[in-house]
Amino acid sequence: MLLISGLLLTQGCLSTTPEPSVIGDLIIAEPIAISYKNEIALARLTQVLQRAEISDGQRAELFYQRGVEYDKVGLRALARFDFNQAINLKPDMSDAYNFLGIHFTQLREFNQAYDAFDSAIELAPDHEYAYLNRGIALYYGGRPNLAADDFKVFRQYQQNDPYRLLWQYLADVELDQKKANQDLVVYALQVGDRVWAKNVIKLYLGEMSQGTFIDRMAEDVNSNEALAERLCEAYFYLGKYSQLQGDANAAINFFKLALSTNVYEFVEHRYAKLELDLMRETALESREP
């Protein structure tokens, strides 16, 4: 891993002069590269789809699997094509609807995202991640009250998962900051102290400084892949934390750092780009006369 200090906030360059919005040394992982396993999986699935005589149901499953592989390496348009093909062949494929909803959210096509997630939940009422993903779509679509309801359902499936608590908090804080903080204190009691992501909760509650949080980001990580995954999460939630603190410049850089990991399939990577797009739009609108 590489340590850098003094991240230049507005230009994304390195500087020997520390900036006040960034505390301490930042950890950078080598971006995750496309593995040969992904390439082989894509080649094999394509070969079977082109040559094999199979049923529509089997073909739908193969399109779905290839869509997932495309999604893992960031080829979103190809993934969407395959998910649509899967649904055309097998209209009751809830997982394909769930993925399409995620992609529509990333494209900010929120009404289409809601429809896709509604279909996923109608087909599979216990599809817990469809509730998470619909909640995220509602959150970015400016409906935090409905998002909070979906995050609550998602949280009930595993109440000691810190990430479920964090998304609940991000919606709740839009509605009532004081109550959101009080609720997070209670929810956090169910999360073990040895779970790394509890540090994010402590940061949000003011129980840990940003500097200490950054110092602990690489704790108990023994490979570059694990480090990249950890940093993808950490920098995304630092970005959201910076937003809550009113530090837009720091938030922008943290979201860029989350993107730099190339962990395409993580929720945090997916929405770091959306966060940047939204912040750029806000900045442009504020400059207009």
Where are these regions (language model features)?
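Structural marker of alpha-solenoid helical repeat scaffolds
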Residues: R51, S55, L89, L123, ...
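N-terminal leader/linker segments that initiate helical-solenoid repeat arrays
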Residues: C13-E61, Q65, R280, L284-P289
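Helix-start (N-cap) detector for alpha-helical repeat units in TPR-like alpha-solenoids
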Residues: D56-A60, S94-D95, E128-Y129, D161-Y163, ...
